[in-house]
């Protein structure tokens, strides 16, 4: 998977996670809030993975 793909999927997961958290909070559904937080963290991880891939590629390109 490319770094851009990781970043895009990460942003999407983070956004969906935020929505789930908001809906869970509004409906007093703690399970949905927890699912949203987990999905948000997954998205943050995917974005970080994309950033690392970019950094590695830039490092390799310098060699």
Curated annotation (Swiss-Prot):
- Chain intervals with Basic and acidic residues compositional bias: 50-63
Give the start-end ranges of region Disordered: 20-63
**Signal peptide limits:** none
Q: Which InterPro entries match?
A: CsbD (IPR008462), YjbJ_sf (IPR036629)
Q: Which family does it belong to?
A: Belongs to the UPF0337 (CsbD) family.
Q: What is this protein called?
A: UPF0337 protein PSPTO_1596
């Amino acid at each position: 998977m490319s770094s851009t793909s990781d970043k895009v999927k990460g942003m999407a997961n983070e956004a969906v996670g935020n929505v789930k958290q908001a809906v869970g909070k509004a409906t007093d559904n703690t399970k949905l809030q927890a699912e949203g937080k987990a999905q948000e963290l997954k998205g943050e991880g995917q974005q970080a993975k994309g950033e690392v891939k970019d950094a590695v590629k830039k490092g390799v390109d310098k060699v």
